[in-house]
């Protein structure tokens, strides 16, 4: 089920929170309808604003709308004209006072919704879908908080007669793990031969006890020291042509030199040999 269900709904109340926060008894259906209308209004009027998320919170006589965007200048407009227009449209829709908060997204490459929008925009501009997917994966994996990403495109890819789905993945994306922090985004690209759906899953680590789990990183010096070859054990040509001394043989040669050096001045009986010794009965 982790492969099919929406990752946000699957982990709701465990690692993810609600995007609409309010309480209603008899007006529940009306509030849900208003929330859908608010999100649709913001998505259709601000396609190029890079809106990653919309959070709605209601009180008795006020509605607070938080817009997380990668381009706050487009949402605000010149001297705040665009923000005033959006606020007026929302007040007309809800018939209540609207508090509009515009928040900037610091790392748009690590937001699944923005990555999906970027891939869909490239597909609309006739960019090859494989190139767009790989470019999005490479830019996302450069972020320090991204541990895995999966990008999937579905539709008439490349203008083919039959629709199909293709995906690319890099890193870990554990969709069945509930404690995993999975960000999910979906967007549609409108092309001349139909619509292509773009889905993005981004894995940002595990959340244990309400805190993100930090994996210990080994120091670079220790890894470098482990990978370096011991001095004097470089593969060299010896014997017949085409034969090369292996790392095991070189290590044995160095071990024999060290044992001979430590036993200088002692009798030959104390020298350790690698030949098997048979105990006398």
UniProtKB/Swiss-Prot annotation:
Function comment: Binds the lower part of the 30S subunit head. Binds mRNA in the 70S ribosome, positioning it for translation.
Residue ranges of coiled coil: none
Gene3D superfamilies (UniProt xref): 3.30.300.20, Ribosomal protein S3, C-terminal domain (3.30.1140.32)
Record family assignment: Belongs to the universal ribosomal protein uS3 family.
Pfam families: KH_2, Ribosomal_S3_C
Gene Ontology molecular function terms on file: mRNA binding; rRNA binding; structural constituent of ribosome
Keyword Iron: no
Top-rank taxon: Bacteria
Residue span of region Disordered: 218-281
Biological process annotations from GO: translation
Subunit structure: Part of the 30S ribosomal subunit. Forms a tight complex with proteins S10 and S14.
Keywords, ordered alphabetically: Ribonucleoprotein, Ribosomal protein, RNA-binding, rRNA-binding
Domain KH type-2: residue ranges: 38-106
Name this protein carries in UniProt: Small ribosomal subunit protein uS3
Cellular component, GO, one term: cytosolic small ribosomal subunit
Biased composition range(s): Low complexity: 238-256
């Amino acid at each position: 089920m982790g492969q099919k269900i929406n990752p946000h709904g699957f982990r709701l109340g465990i690692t993810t929170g609600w995007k609409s926060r309010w309480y209603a008894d008899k007006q529940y259906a009306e509030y849900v309808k208003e929330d859908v209308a608010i999100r649709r209004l913001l998505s259709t009027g601000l396609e190029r604003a890079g809106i990653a998320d919309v959070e709605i919170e209601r009180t008795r006589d006020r509605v607070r709308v938080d817009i997380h965007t990668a381009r706050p200048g487009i949402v605000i407009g010149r001297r705040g004209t665009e923000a005033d227009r959006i606020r007026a449209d929302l007040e007309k829709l809800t018939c209540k006072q609207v508090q509009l908060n515009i928040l900037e997204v610091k790392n748009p490459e690590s937001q699944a919704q923005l990555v999906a929008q970027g891939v869909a925009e490239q597909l609309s501009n006739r960019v090859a879908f494989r190139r767009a997917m790989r470019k999005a994966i490479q830019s996302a994996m450069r972020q320090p908080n991204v541990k895995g990403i999966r990008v999937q495109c579905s539709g008439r890819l490349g203008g083919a007669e039959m629709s199909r789905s293709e995906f690319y993945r890099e890193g870990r994306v554990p969709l069945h793990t509930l404690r995993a922090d999975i960000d999910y985004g979906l967007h549609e690209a409108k092309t001349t031969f139909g619509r292509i759906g773009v889905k993005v899953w981004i894995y940002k680590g595990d959340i244990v006890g309400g805190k993100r789990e930090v994996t210990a990183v080994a120091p670079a010096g220790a890894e470098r020291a482990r990978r370096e070859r011991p001095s004097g054990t470089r593969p060299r040509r010896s014997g017949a042509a085409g034969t090369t001394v292996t790392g095991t043989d070189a290590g044995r040669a160095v071990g024999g030199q060290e044992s001979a050096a430590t036993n200088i001045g002692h009798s030959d009986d104390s020298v350790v040999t690698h030949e098997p010794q048979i105990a006398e009965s």
